Amino acid sequence: MENPRSASLQKSWKFVRESLLLCLIAGRGEAQCDGCIEYCCDGVPPFCCSYYAYVGDVLSGTAISGIVFGVVFLMGAVAAVFLCVCMCVKNSRGSRVGVFSSTYINTVTQGYPGPPPPPYSYDHEMFPPDLRPPPYTPTVPRSANYSPPPPYPGFSRK
């Protein structure tokens, strides 16, 4: 009686040999490049390949723009996380910059000390008053007292 383990091993080797033989026989035939003649790659035998394999190592514009968009997007995400972490750390302690003290913020929100500025007048304009344009006066639309243009010379309605 034959060992069941050796029988399964023989079946496995038979499958490998037949698969290898099939690959070798199929590999010797010519590739069908009828549908992809523009992208038929050189080789023995010639084979159909994708556009990017046909172009080679040169990246297309779409691929480059996708890479640039991805890098910029990741940089923005990293910057947002960095700002969030910085703001959270900053809120736990006082500000290191002196201009953000509470007295400065109160001064800005309540107005500067001292008298208010003078009211705005046209005396401070760049041009003197005599160079200003005249006031706007709407004009009445003109009536159409002209004849229509002549007909197009290349087309006749006869």
From Swiss-Prot:
Name a GO CC annotation attached to this entry.
Answer: membrane
| Signal sequence coordinates | 1-31
Keywords of the record, alphabetical order, are:
Membrane, Signal, Transmembrane, Transmembrane helix
Report the transmembrane regions from the record: 63-83
Mind telling me what this protein is named? Cysteine and tyrosine-rich protein 1
Family listed: Belongs to the CYYR1 family.
| Positions in the Cytoplasmic compartment | 84-158
- What membrane topology does the annotation report for this chain? Single-pass type I membrane protein
Instruction: Fetch the InterPro entries from UniProt.
Output: CYYR1
Q: Tell me which domain of life the UniProt entry assigns to the organism this sequence originates from.
A: Eukaryota
Which species expresses this protein natively? Danio rerio (Zebrafish)
Q: Where is this region: Disordered?
A: 119-158
Where are the compositionally biased (Pro residues) regions?
147-158
Per UniProt, subcellular location reads as: Membrane
